[in-house]
Amino acid sequence: VSDDRPITVLHLVANRWWTGSAEPVIRLLLGLRARGHRVLLGLIPGDRFEQKAREAGLEPLADLSLEVRGNPVHALADLRRVRQAIRAEAVDVVHAHHSHDHWLGWLGRGRAGLVRSFHNARAARRDWPSTWLYRRTDALLAVSHEIEERLRRVGVPPARLSRVDGVVDLARFESGDGAAIRAEFALGHAPVLGCVARLAPRRGHELLIRGFQQLLPEYPHARLLLVGKGEARARLEALVSGLGLTREVLFAGYRDADLPAVLQALDAFALMGAGSDESCRAALEAMAAGRPVVGRRVGALPETVVHGVTGLLVDDDRPESVAQALRALVAEPERAAAMGRAGRDRARAFFGPDAHAAQVERVYRRVLAARERAR
């Protein structure tokens, strides 16, 4: 396959929500399209992901359900629809993002190449049907070294594995004004630390809160802004109340349209857990907004944050360690601002839609060249 011929790619995404793989997939499709490729999208219709895809100018395939727990009749109808689309649209590559659509893509691929993205380590399964499928997939993409190593351990040939960086909408997060957010929460000129993450178990909010608490004797005017919604909110609010921090720790709820402004209101960003998207997109958004990042060594954060340059990495789960990192940025605002600028430069260089799409495009061309040689 020539290096300049446009590629037609069918992305299958068994996701209905605006979480996990959803936004990275849309950013990738837009990046591929901007590079001259033709992109098709199959998704679960009727929910937030479809709404966001259409808002981005992407028209999902019709007559496709992708229901993970659908009945066999729906599954067979989906297989027929995928096969028909691959033939009618002359699809070169089928790119799956979840286990369900991975199997569907393998069964319906015909002569097209098959690529699978893994957005979190839990998706890399160890059971024999999954490992059998992985070894018969042309390329597997991991958004972190942790996922890459897990796939190696289950027997995926190294030649089929590729590590790809996360992706962020640079244009959206490089602009914004935090003044309205500071006014909304009466933050004034206080040093403000923030976290954008679902309020759920294993996201590290308790660790962050307890680390922040240790900062307050030296910096009593500091504030912690927790952005997000989720089932753990009541528990976290009870923790904050029990620690006597209801004035210092603020719950901002779920923010979407004004998220860039929220990030601009922060002096530093903190993320203690990776969630369902282990590229840690929230940290990438903070970097694009010019905020320094404090993060635990989870997901792709060790590859995203350059310790001492774009932020600080915490090596363990002790509140004392988190407090030390937060204190370093609050104590030296000029250093924190310089880290934020370096983070923005790094986001522009490596994590924009074009850079991400170029990485994936190289994988596609390698897959197609190998399949051409094998014919």
Task: Give each language-model segment a name.
Residues T19-L30, P191, C195-Q214, E231-E237, ...:
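A conserved mid-protein helix/loop that constitutes part of the nucleotide-sugar donor-binding site
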Residues G42, P292-G295, V305:
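Short hydrophobic beta-strand element within catalytic cores of glycosyltransferases
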Residues A96-H102:
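Short His-centered aromatic/hydrophobic patch
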Residues F173-L187, L259:
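A short helix/loop element that forms part of the nucleotide-sugar donor recognition site in Leloir-type
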Residues A232-R235, T246-R255, V262, L312-L313:
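Active-site donor-binding acidic/aromatic loop of nucleotide-activated sugar
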Residues H307-G308, L312-P319, A328-P333:
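Conserved acidic donor-binding segment of nucleotide-sugar-dependent glycosyltransferases
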